[in-house]
UniProtKB/Swiss-Prot annotation:
One of its GO terms (cellular component) is nucleus. Residues 17-32 have a biased composition (Basic and acidic residues). SMART domains: AP2 (SM00380). This is Ethylene-responsive transcription factor TINY. The lineage of its organism: Eukaryota, Viridiplantae, Streptophyta, Embryophyta, Tracheophyta. It comes from Arabidopsis thaliana (Mouse-ear cress). Keywords: Activator, DNA-binding, Nucleus, Transcription, Transcription regulation. PROSITE patterns: AP2_ERF. Gene3D superfamilies: AP2/ERF domain. Belongs to the AP2/ERF transcription factor family. ERF subfamily. Induction: Slightly induced by cold stress. It is found in: Nucleus.
């Protein structure tokens, strides 16, 4: 009787000791986010998202993101595309604002998921769109647009730009790679023929340089 009780006491003590040792063992971290579905954390701190294809063992890789929220939005778009209204979402309030893939191919789902991941939510949700592109993407797109516009302006300028004529040039004058012809009366081999009407219209300042009356009588 005494031996039986001591055996039970020893077994109970062994069980307690085993339970304590189990508690002390480190719990293996699966990397899954405690809140967001379809989101895991990499050892180097990035967050990844993927989703299983319907009726297949393969998964669609959605990308690696700097924040769990971005990965969660990517998962929501993929879940909506594959499962439809039955999908369990991380952000159900944004379901009407998420981009939709053009088809159910893995590639198109990835593209739509990336668009949703790189958007940030606004404070108020509306039926139109409660998502806007992040500031970094907006700046990049704007710089690209400005750069292309500037390039077009420079090309147009090269087409329509004309050389500056300055004050005056005599004869055939070279300016850079372009030639400008100035029709100067000083280079004429013969004086022009003047009629009486033309003579009356000549300014007085020119009559000092030319004997216009003589030219008229020529």
């Amino acid at each position: 009787m005494i031996a039986s009780e001591s055996t039970k006491s020893w077994e109970a003590s062994a069980v307690r000791q085993e339970n304590e040792e189990e508690k002390k063992k480190p719990v293996k971290d699966s990397g899954k986010h405690p809140v967001y579905r379809g989101v895991r954390k990499r050892n180097w701190g990035k967050w990844v998202s993927e989703i299983r294809e319907p009726r297949k063992k393969s998964r669609i890789w959605l990308g690696t993101f700097p924040s769990p929220e971005m990965a969660a939005r990517a998962h929501d778009v993929a879940a909506l595309s594959i499962k439809g209204a039955s999908a369990i979402l991380n952000f159900p309030d944004l379901a009407g604002s998420f981009p939709r893939p053009s088809s159910l191919s893995p590639r198109d789902i990835q593209v739509a998921a990336l668009k949703a991941a790189h958007m940030e939510t606004s404070q108020s949700f509306s039926s139109s769109s409660s998502l806007t592109f992040s500031s970094s993407q907006s700046s990049s797109s704007l710089e690209s647009l400005v750069s292309s516009s500037a390039t077009g302006s420079e090309e147009l300028g090269e087409i329509v730009e004309l050389p500056s004529l300055g004050s005056s040039y005599d004869g055939l004058t070279q300016l850079g790679n372009e030639f400008i012809f100035s029709d100067s009366a000083d280079l004429w081999p013969y004086p022009p023929q003047w009629s009486e009407g033309d003579y009356q219209m000549i300014p007085a300042s020119l009559s000092q340089d030319w004997d216009l009356q003589g030219l008229y009588n020529y």
